C-alpha cells in the first residue's frame, strides 16, 4: 500500500512539474503582452505595472500590422472545411476497407498506414512545385492537400472502430429499405460519433496551428492563416516589434486552447472507444 502511495505521489509530482514547464512560456508571453517594448527584453519576468503597463496597445497594434482579423477568417474557413472533408472521405474509406475484403482494400489500408510515417519534409519541395503547376495556391487547393496528409491517421482510427460494428445492424437497415449510402449516414456514421469527435479535434488543432504547409502552397499576397500573420511582424534584418508580437501570439493561441479545454474529454472517450472496440 505504501509503495502504491509513493508511486502515485511521485507521478503527481512529475506531471505537475511537466505541466508547469508547458505552461511557463504561455504565461510569459501573456505577461509580456501588456508591457512596453523596451521592458520586454529588460524585465521579461516582472509583472507589468506602472510605466511598464500599456494595456491593450500591443494587441491593437498587432491586429493592425498583421491583418489578423482576415487571417482568423481564412483560418476558420480552411480548418472547418478541411476537417469536414477529412471526416466524410476518411470515414467512407474506412467503411469500405472494413466491409469489402479484397487485395485492393488491404493495399489501400497499408498505404494509409505508410502515409502516417512519411515525414512531410521529404516531399514538401516537390509538393510545392506540383501545387504551383496545378494552380492550387488558394484555400480550396490547400483543403485538398490537407485531406491527403490527414487521411492516414483518420482512416486508421475509423477502421479500428468500424471493425467492431456488428454487420447485422447494417443488414437490418438494408432489409428496412436503406441503400448503402443511407445505411452509412443513418446507421454507421452516428455509431462512429466518438471517433468522429476525436478525429475532428486532432485534425482541427493540427490544421489551425500549421505554418509550413500553407506558407509553401498559398499565395500569401491574397491569403494567409493566423501563424503566417504572426510571421509578418518580423521586419527587415531580423527586427521584430516584440510588443505587437506578444499580443498577436496571445490572440493566436487563445482560440485553440479554449477549443482543446472544451473538447479534451472527448479525445479520451474516442481513443478508449476505438481501442476497446477495435
Regions found by a protein language model. Give the residues of each.
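A structural signal for multi-pass alpha-helical bundles of membrane permease subunits
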Residues: 2-278
